Protein backbone atom coordinates (compact mmCIF):
# COMPACT_ATOMS: atom_id res chain seq x y z
CA UNK A 1 0.00 0.00 0.00
CA UNK A 2 1.95 3.03 -1.24
CA UNK A 3 1.19 5.96 1.01
CA UNK A 4 1.70 9.59 -0.04
CA UNK A 5 2.46 10.55 3.54
CA UNK A 6 4.59 8.43 5.84
CA UNK A 7 2.52 6.20 8.05
CA UNK A 8 2.73 6.99 11.78
CA UNK A 9 3.31 3.80 13.80
CA UNK A 10 3.77 3.56 17.57
CA UNK A 11 4.17 0.42 19.71
CA UNK A 12 3.89 0.36 23.50
CA UNK A 13 3.54 -2.17 26.29
CA UNK A 14 1.45 -1.91 29.46
CA UNK A 15 1.25 -3.95 32.66
CA UNK A 16 -1.36 -5.96 34.51
CA UNK A 17 -2.36 -4.62 37.93
CA UNK A 18 -3.80 -6.56 40.85
CA UNK A 19 -6.06 -4.73 43.30
CA UNK A 20 -5.40 -5.22 47.01
CA UNK A 21 -8.36 -2.97 47.88
CA UNK A 22 -10.96 -4.05 45.34
CA UNK A 23 -13.05 -2.04 42.88
CA UNK A 24 -16.50 -3.58 42.43
CA UNK A 25 -19.43 -1.50 41.29
CA UNK A 26 -20.02 1.66 39.26
CA UNK A 27 -22.02 4.74 40.12
CA UNK A 28 -22.03 5.73 36.43
CA UNK A 29 -22.10 2.96 33.82
CA UNK A 30 -21.26 5.15 30.84
CA UNK A 31 -18.39 7.17 32.33
CA UNK A 32 -17.24 4.12 34.34
CA UNK A 33 -17.08 5.87 37.72
CA UNK A 34 -16.60 3.57 40.73
CA UNK A 35 -18.62 3.45 43.95
CA UNK A 36 -15.36 3.30 45.94
CA UNK A 37 -11.65 4.04 45.59
CA UNK A 38 -9.24 1.13 45.03
CA UNK A 39 -5.54 0.38 45.37
CA UNK A 40 -3.41 -1.93 43.26
CA UNK A 41 0.04 -3.36 42.66
CA UNK A 42 1.48 -3.14 39.14
CA UNK A 43 3.06 -6.41 38.00
CA UNK A 44 6.30 -6.60 36.02
CA UNK A 45 6.00 -6.63 32.24
CA UNK A 46 8.83 -9.14 31.88
CA UNK A 47 6.20 -11.73 32.86
CA UNK A 48 2.79 -10.19 32.03
CA UNK A 49 2.08 -7.48 29.51
CA UNK A 50 -0.05 -6.27 26.66
CA UNK A 51 1.74 -5.04 23.54
CA UNK A 52 -0.16 -2.65 21.26
CA UNK A 53 0.72 -1.10 17.91
CA UNK A 54 -1.35 1.79 16.54
CA UNK A 55 -0.90 3.22 13.05
CA UNK A 56 -2.62 6.05 11.18
CA UNK A 57 -2.55 6.72 7.49
CA UNK A 58 -4.56 8.73 4.98
CA UNK A 59 -4.94 5.46 3.05
CA UNK A 60 -6.90 3.64 5.77
CA UNK A 61 -10.62 3.60 4.97
CA UNK A 62 -11.90 2.63 8.44
CA UNK A 63 -10.80 2.17 12.04
CA UNK A 64 -9.82 -1.49 12.60
CA UNK A 65 -8.53 -3.55 15.53
CA UNK A 66 -6.97 -7.01 15.89
CA UNK A 67 -6.69 -8.70 19.31
CA UNK A 68 -4.32 -11.65 19.60
CA UNK A 69 -4.37 -12.01 15.81
CA UNK A 70 -8.16 -11.95 15.35
CA UNK A 71 -10.00 -8.94 13.97
CA UNK A 72 -12.59 -7.64 16.44
CA UNK A 73 -15.50 -5.24 16.09
CA UNK A 74 -14.21 -1.67 16.30
CA UNK A 75 -17.80 -0.60 16.95
CA UNK A 76 -17.61 -1.90 20.54
CA UNK A 77 -18.89 1.00 22.68
CA UNK A 78 -15.88 0.98 25.02
CA UNK A 79 -13.36 0.98 22.18
CA UNK A 80 -15.28 3.82 20.58
CA UNK A 81 -15.31 5.75 23.88
CA UNK A 82 -11.50 5.48 24.15
CA UNK A 83 -10.94 6.56 20.56
CA UNK A 84 -13.40 9.45 20.85
CA UNK A 85 -11.78 10.66 24.06
CA UNK A 86 -8.22 10.56 22.63
CA UNK A 87 -9.28 12.37 19.46
CA UNK A 88 -11.11 14.97 21.57
CA UNK A 89 -7.96 15.57 23.65
CA UNK A 90 -5.88 15.82 20.46
CA UNK A 91 -8.29 18.40 18.99
CA UNK A 92 -8.25 20.33 22.27
CA UNK A 93 -4.45 20.32 22.31
CA UNK A 94 -4.40 21.62 18.74
CA UNK A 95 -6.98 24.34 19.43
CA UNK A 96 -5.00 25.40 22.52
CA UNK A 97 -2.22 26.37 20.13
CA UNK A 98 0.21 23.53 20.85
CA UNK A 99 2.48 22.65 17.99
CA UNK A 100 1.46 19.29 16.61
CA UNK A 101 4.47 16.93 16.88
CA UNK A 102 2.99 14.79 14.11
CA UNK A 103 1.49 16.84 11.27
CA UNK A 104 -1.43 14.57 10.57
CA UNK A 105 -5.11 14.91 10.10
CA UNK A 106 -7.39 13.87 12.94
CA UNK A 107 -9.68 12.50 10.26
CA UNK A 108 -7.19 9.74 9.41
CA UNK A 109 -8.37 6.27 10.36
CA UNK A 110 -6.42 4.16 12.84
CA UNK A 111 -5.41 0.50 12.75
CA UNK A 112 -4.63 -1.17 16.09
CA UNK A 113 -3.11 -4.58 16.84
CA UNK A 114 -2.83 -5.80 20.40
CA UNK A 115 -1.65 -9.03 22.00
CA UNK A 116 -1.28 -10.38 25.52
CA UNK A 117 1.46 -12.76 26.59
CA UNK A 118 -1.03 -14.38 29.02
CA UNK A 119 -4.57 -15.86 28.76
CA UNK A 120 -7.26 -13.28 27.95
CA UNK A 121 -10.45 -13.07 30.06
CA UNK A 122 -9.31 -15.71 32.55
CA UNK A 123 -9.21 -13.47 35.60
CA UNK A 124 -5.71 -12.14 34.90
CA UNK A 125 -6.86 -8.53 34.43
CA UNK A 126 -6.34 -8.60 30.68
CA UNK A 127 -8.82 -5.79 29.98
CA UNK A 128 -6.97 -3.45 32.37
CA UNK A 129 -3.63 -3.98 30.63
CA UNK A 130 -5.32 -3.90 27.22
CA UNK A 131 -7.13 -0.59 27.61
CA UNK A 132 -4.21 1.06 29.43
CA UNK A 133 -1.99 0.05 26.53
CA UNK A 134 -4.52 1.27 23.97
CA UNK A 135 -4.85 4.66 25.68
CA UNK A 136 -1.09 5.07 26.10
CA UNK A 137 -0.32 4.06 22.50
CA UNK A 138 -3.04 6.24 20.94
CA UNK A 139 -1.85 9.16 23.07
CA UNK A 140 1.64 8.77 21.57
CA UNK A 141 0.21 8.59 18.05
CA UNK A 142 -1.90 11.72 18.50
CA UNK A 143 0.60 13.71 20.58
CA UNK A 144 -1.61 13.83 23.68
CA UNK A 145 0.39 14.34 26.88
CA UNK A 146 -2.38 15.02 29.43
CA UNK A 147 -3.53 12.59 32.14
CA UNK A 148 -4.92 9.47 30.48
CA UNK A 149 -6.97 8.17 33.44
CA UNK A 150 -10.23 9.15 31.78
CA UNK A 151 -9.34 7.59 28.43
CA UNK A 152 -8.25 4.26 29.93
CA UNK A 153 -11.14 4.23 32.42
CA UNK A 154 -13.68 4.53 29.61
CA UNK A 155 -12.40 1.19 28.32
CA UNK A 156 -12.12 -0.67 31.63
CA UNK A 157 -12.29 0.97 35.04
CA UNK A 158 -9.22 -0.70 36.48
CA UNK A 159 -7.22 0.14 33.32
CA UNK A 160 -6.45 3.60 34.72
CA UNK A 161 -4.42 1.89 37.47
CA UNK A 162 -2.21 0.22 34.80
CA UNK A 163 -1.00 3.66 33.63
CA UNK A 164 1.51 3.73 36.50
CA UNK A 165 4.10 1.42 37.94
CA UNK A 166 4.51 0.43 41.57
CA UNK A 167 1.54 0.94 43.89
CA UNK A 168 -1.41 2.86 42.49
CA UNK A 169 -4.57 4.42 43.89
CA UNK A 170 -7.68 4.99 41.77
CA UNK A 171 -9.49 7.84 43.50
CA UNK A 172 -13.24 7.42 43.09
CA UNK A 173 -13.76 11.18 42.83
CA UNK A 174 -16.96 13.06 43.58
CA UNK A 175 -17.76 15.04 40.44
CA UNK A 176 -20.59 13.71 38.27
CA UNK A 177 -18.49 14.31 35.13
CA UNK A 178 -15.72 12.07 36.53
CA UNK A 179 -12.92 14.61 36.03
CA UNK A 180 -11.59 13.85 39.53
CA UNK A 181 -11.83 10.05 39.18
CA UNK A 182 -8.16 9.53 38.41
CA UNK A 183 -5.28 7.17 39.12
CA UNK A 184 -2.15 8.31 40.95
CA UNK A 185 0.97 6.54 42.16
CA UNK A 186 1.25 5.84 45.91
CA UNK A 187 4.83 4.49 45.71
CA UNK A 188 7.15 3.65 42.78
CA UNK A 189 8.15 0.09 41.78
CA UNK A 190 11.55 0.57 43.45
CA UNK A 191 9.91 1.18 46.85
CA UNK A 192 9.60 -2.45 48.05
CA UNK A 193 12.22 -4.51 46.17
CA UNK A 194 11.73 -7.67 48.28
CA UNK A 195 8.03 -8.02 47.40
CA UNK A 196 7.23 -10.96 45.13
CA UNK A 197 4.03 -12.03 43.41
CA UNK A 198 2.98 -15.58 42.49
CA UNK A 199 0.03 -16.13 40.16
CA UNK A 200 -1.50 -19.56 40.62
CA UNK A 201 -3.35 -20.26 37.37
CA UNK A 202 -6.24 -22.57 38.20
CA UNK A 203 -8.08 -22.07 34.95
CA UNK A 204 -7.36 -20.32 31.70
CA UNK A 205 -11.00 -20.65 30.63
CA UNK A 206 -13.36 -17.72 30.26
CA UNK A 207 -15.25 -17.07 33.47
CA UNK A 208 -19.00 -17.82 33.69
CA UNK A 209 -20.03 -14.19 34.32
CA UNK A 210 -17.90 -11.24 33.23
CA UNK A 211 -17.02 -8.46 35.65
CA UNK A 212 -19.25 -5.85 34.01
CA UNK A 213 -22.46 -7.89 34.35
CA UNK A 214 -21.41 -9.17 37.78
CA UNK A 215 -20.77 -5.81 39.37
CA UNK A 216 -23.93 -4.29 37.92
CA UNK A 217 -26.01 -7.03 39.56
CA UNK A 218 -24.11 -6.53 42.84
CA UNK A 219 -24.78 -2.77 42.85
CA UNK A 220 -28.48 -3.42 42.26
CA UNK A 221 -28.96 -6.17 44.86
CA UNK A 222 -26.22 -6.26 47.53
CA UNK A 223 -26.73 -4.19 50.68
CA UNK A 224 -23.34 -5.47 51.88
CA UNK A 225 -21.63 -3.92 48.84
CA UNK A 226 -23.15 -0.51 49.61
CA UNK A 227 -22.00 -0.72 53.24
CA UNK A 228 -18.53 -1.82 52.15
CA UNK A 229 -18.15 1.09 49.72
CA UNK A 230 -19.39 3.75 52.11
CA UNK A 231 -18.14 2.61 55.52
CA UNK A 232 -15.31 0.11 55.10
CA UNK A 233 -13.25 1.04 52.04
CA UNK A 234 -12.22 4.62 53.02
CA UNK A 235 -10.39 3.57 56.24
CA UNK A 236 -8.99 0.52 54.41
CA UNK A 237 -7.49 2.73 51.69
CA UNK A 238 -5.71 4.81 54.34
CA UNK A 239 -4.49 1.71 56.19
CA UNK A 240 -3.29 -0.04 53.01
CA UNK A 241 -1.39 3.08 51.92
CA UNK A 242 0.29 3.19 55.32
CA UNK A 243 1.23 -0.53 55.17
CA UNK A 244 2.83 -0.02 51.75
CA UNK A 245 4.71 3.14 52.76
CA UNK A 246 6.06 1.37 55.87
CA UNK A 247 6.72 -1.88 53.94
CA UNK A 248 4.84 -3.71 56.71
CA UNK A 249 4.22 -7.09 55.09
CA UNK A 250 2.27 -8.63 57.98
CA UNK A 251 -0.31 -5.84 58.00
CA UNK A 252 -0.30 -5.54 54.18
CA UNK A 253 -0.87 -9.29 53.79
CA UNK A 254 -3.67 -9.54 56.33
CA UNK A 255 -5.54 -6.55 54.92
CA UNK A 256 -5.11 -7.87 51.36
CA UNK A 257 -6.66 -11.23 52.31
CA UNK A 258 -9.49 -9.63 54.30
CA UNK A 259 -10.37 -7.33 51.42
CA UNK A 260 -10.37 -10.20 48.92
CA UNK A 261 -12.63 -12.24 51.20
CA UNK A 262 -14.98 -9.30 51.66
CA UNK A 263 -15.19 -8.70 47.91
CA UNK A 264 -16.19 -12.35 47.37
CA UNK A 265 -18.67 -12.05 50.25
CA UNK A 266 -20.38 -9.20 48.37
CA UNK A 267 -20.54 -11.49 45.32
CA UNK A 268 -22.33 -14.13 47.44
CA UNK A 269 -24.57 -11.37 48.84
CA UNK A 270 -25.55 -10.49 45.27
CA UNK A 271 -28.91 -11.91 44.17
CA UNK A 272 -28.77 -14.34 42.47
CA UNK A 273 -25.36 -15.03 44.06
CA UNK A 274 -22.16 -14.99 42.03
CA UNK A 275 -19.31 -17.36 42.82
CA UNK A 276 -15.99 -16.74 41.11
CA UNK A 277 -13.96 -19.03 43.38
CA UNK A 278 -13.59 -22.73 42.59
CA UNK A 279 -12.88 -25.66 44.92
CA UNK A 280 -9.20 -25.25 44.06
CA UNK A 281 -9.38 -21.54 44.96
CA UNK A 282 -10.72 -22.47 48.39
CA UNK A 283 -7.99 -25.09 48.85
CA UNK A 284 -5.38 -22.42 48.08
CA UNK A 285 -6.94 -20.17 50.75
CA UNK A 286 -6.69 -23.06 53.23
CA UNK A 287 -3.08 -23.74 52.22
CA UNK A 288 -2.08 -20.10 52.78
CA UNK A 289 -3.64 -19.94 56.25
CA UNK A 290 -2.02 -23.25 57.30
CA UNK A 291 1.36 -22.12 55.94
CA UNK A 292 1.11 -18.87 57.92
CA UNK A 293 -0.06 -20.68 61.07
CA UNK A 294 2.98 -22.97 60.84
CA UNK A 295 5.27 -19.92 60.81
CA UNK A 296 3.30 -18.03 63.45
CA UNK A 297 3.05 -14.95 61.22
CA UNK A 298 1.66 -13.79 57.88
CA UNK A 299 4.34 -14.79 55.39
CA UNK A 300 2.08 -15.19 52.33
CA UNK A 301 -1.19 -13.49 51.36
CA UNK A 302 -3.76 -14.33 48.68
CA UNK A 303 -6.11 -12.16 46.70
CA UNK A 304 -8.65 -13.24 44.07
CA UNK A 305 -10.27 -11.02 41.46
CA UNK A 306 -13.41 -12.01 39.55
CA UNK A 307 -12.07 -15.46 38.71
CA UNK A 308 -10.58 -18.58 40.31
CA UNK A 309 -6.87 -17.74 39.88
CA UNK A 310 -4.99 -16.82 43.05
CA UNK A 311 -2.49 -13.99 43.27
CA UNK A 312 -0.17 -14.55 46.20
CA UNK A 313 2.07 -11.85 47.69
CA UNK A 314 5.14 -12.78 49.69
CA UNK A 315 8.72 -11.64 50.28
CA UNK A 316 11.70 -13.00 48.35
CA UNK A 317 12.96 -15.10 51.28
CA UNK A 318 9.67 -17.07 51.41
CA UNK A 319 9.04 -17.71 47.70
CA UNK A 320 10.93 -21.01 47.42
CA UNK A 321 9.30 -22.62 50.45
CA UNK A 322 5.80 -21.54 49.46
CA UNK A 323 6.25 -22.76 45.86
CA UNK A 324 7.37 -26.12 47.32
CA UNK A 325 4.21 -26.16 49.48
CA UNK A 326 2.06 -25.52 46.40
CA UNK A 327 3.86 -28.29 44.47
CA UNK A 328 3.29 -30.64 47.41
CA UNK A 329 -0.45 -29.90 47.68
CA UNK A 330 -1.15 -29.43 43.95
CA UNK A 331 1.45 -31.54 42.13
CA UNK A 332 1.69 -30.97 38.38
CA UNK A 333 0.21 -33.88 36.43
CA UNK A 334 2.86 -34.04 33.75
CA UNK A 335 4.49 -30.74 32.89
CA UNK A 336 6.80 -30.55 35.91
CA UNK A 337 9.34 -28.45 34.05
CA UNK A 338 6.71 -26.01 32.75
CA UNK A 339 4.85 -25.72 36.06
CA UNK A 340 6.81 -22.64 37.13
CA UNK A 341 7.14 -19.72 34.72
CA UNK A 342 8.68 -16.28 35.13
CA UNK A 343 11.33 -15.47 37.72
CA UNK A 344 13.55 -18.43 38.64
CA UNK A 345 12.82 -20.10 42.00
CA UNK A 346 15.30 -22.47 43.63
CA UNK A 347 13.74 -25.85 44.52
CA UNK A 348 13.72 -26.59 48.26
CA UNK A 349 12.59 -29.55 50.36
CA UNK A 350 9.63 -29.08 52.69
CA UNK A 351 10.09 -29.99 56.33
CA UNK A 352 8.03 -32.92 57.62
CA UNK A 353 6.50 -30.53 60.17
CA UNK A 354 5.17 -28.24 57.43
CA UNK A 355 3.89 -31.21 55.40
CA UNK A 356 2.00 -32.42 58.47
CA UNK A 357 0.51 -28.95 59.06
CA UNK A 358 -0.61 -28.65 55.43
CA UNK A 359 -2.29 -32.03 55.90
CA UNK A 360 -4.14 -31.95 52.60
CA UNK A 361 -4.52 -34.82 50.18
CA UNK A 362 -2.63 -33.76 47.05
CA UNK A 363 -4.87 -32.79 44.12
CA UNK A 364 -2.77 -33.36 41.00
CA UNK A 365 -3.27 -31.05 38.05
CA UNK A 366 -5.69 -28.62 39.70
CA UNK A 367 -3.16 -25.79 39.43
CA UNK A 368 -2.06 -25.57 35.81
CA UNK A 369 1.05 -23.45 36.39
CA UNK A 370 2.57 -20.70 38.53
CA UNK A 371 3.89 -17.36 37.23
CA UNK A 372 6.54 -15.84 39.51
CA UNK A 373 6.87 -12.07 39.14
CA UNK A 374 7.45 -8.84 41.04
CA UNK A 375 6.34 -5.21 41.18
CA UNK A 376 7.04 -3.41 37.91
CA UNK A 377 6.92 -0.13 35.99
CA UNK A 378 4.13 1.54 34.02
CA UNK A 379 3.67 1.58 30.23
CA UNK A 380 6.72 1.70 27.96
CA UNK A 381 7.28 2.86 24.37
CA UNK A 382 9.14 0.34 22.20
CA UNK A 383 11.50 2.14 19.81
CA UNK A 384 12.52 -0.96 17.86
CA UNK A 385 10.54 -1.05 14.56
CA UNK A 386 10.88 -4.84 14.68
CA UNK A 387 8.51 -4.82 17.66
CA UNK A 388 5.61 -3.41 15.62
CA UNK A 389 2.64 -5.78 15.35
CA UNK A 390 1.49 -4.07 12.13
CA UNK A 391 3.41 -4.25 8.86
CA UNK A 392 4.12 -1.40 6.42
CA UNK A 393 0.68 -2.00 4.86
CA UNK A 394 -1.03 -1.35 8.20
CA UNK A 395 -2.14 -4.97 8.56
CA UNK A 396 -0.99 -7.46 11.23
CA UNK A 397 2.36 -9.03 10.50
CA UNK A 398 2.10 -12.78 9.88
CA UNK A 399 2.86 -14.83 12.99
CA UNK A 400 6.52 -15.76 13.14
UniProtKB/Swiss-Prot annotation:
- Per UniProt, the enzyme's principal EC class comes to lyase
Q: Which residues form a coiled coil?
A: none
Any one of the GO BP annotations? cholesterol biosynthetic process
The similarity comment for this entry is: Belongs to the diphosphomevalonate decarboxylase family.
Which domain of life does the protein's organism represent?
A: Eukaryota
Q: Which residue positions does the secretion signal occupy? A: none
| EC id | 4.1.1.33
Q: State where the protein is found.
A: Cytoplasm
Which residues take part in binding (R)-5-diphosphomevalonate?
Answer: 23-26, 78, 156-161, 212
Organism annotation:
Bos taurus (Bovine)
Keywords for this entry?
Answer: Acetylation, ATP-binding, Cholesterol biosynthesis, Cholesterol metabolism, Cytoplasm, Lipid biosynthesis, Lipid metabolism, Lyase, Nucleotide-binding, Steroid biosynthesis, Steroid metabolism, Sterol biosynthesis, Sterol metabolism
Q: List the protein's name.
A: Diphosphomevalonate decarboxylase
- What does this protein do, in the record's words? Catalyzes the ATP dependent decarboxylation of (R)-5-diphosphomevalonate to form isopentenyl diphosphate (IPP). Functions in the mevalonate (MVA) pathway leading to isopentenyl diphosphate (IPP), a key precursor for the biosynthesis of isoprenoids and sterol synthesis.
Gene3D superfamilies in the record, alphabetically?
3.30.230.10, GHMP kinase, C-terminal domain
GO molecular function, a single term: diphosphomevalonate decarboxylase activity
Q: Record keywords: Aminoacyl-tRNA synthetase included?
A: no
The record's InterPro entries line, in alphabetical order, gives: GHMP_kinase_C_sf, Mev_decarb, Mev_diP_decarb, MVD-like_N, Mvd1_C, Ribosomal_Su5_D2-typ_SF, Ribsml_uS5_D2-typ_fold_subgr
Give the metabolic or biological pathway: Steroid biosynthesis; cholesterol biosynthesis
Query: What cellular component terms from Gene Ontology apply here?
Result: cytosol
* Self-association state and partner proteins as the record states: Homodimer.
Query: What reaction(s) does this enzyme catalyze?
Result: (R)-5-diphosphomevalonate + ATP = isopentenyl diphosphate + ADP + phosphate + CO2
User: Positions modified as N-acetylalanine?
Assistant: 2
Amino acid sequence: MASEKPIVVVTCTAPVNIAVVKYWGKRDEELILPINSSLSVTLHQDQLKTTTTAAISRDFTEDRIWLNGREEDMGHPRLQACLREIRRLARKRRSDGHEDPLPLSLSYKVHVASENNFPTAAGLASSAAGYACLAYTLARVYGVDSDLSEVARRGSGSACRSLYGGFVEWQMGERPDGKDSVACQVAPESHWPELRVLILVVSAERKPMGSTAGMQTSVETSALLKFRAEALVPPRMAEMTRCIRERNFQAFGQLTMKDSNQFHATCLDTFPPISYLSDTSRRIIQLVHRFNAHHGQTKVAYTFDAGPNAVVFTLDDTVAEFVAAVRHSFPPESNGDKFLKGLPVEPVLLSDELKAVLGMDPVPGSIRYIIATQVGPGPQVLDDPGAHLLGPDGLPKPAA
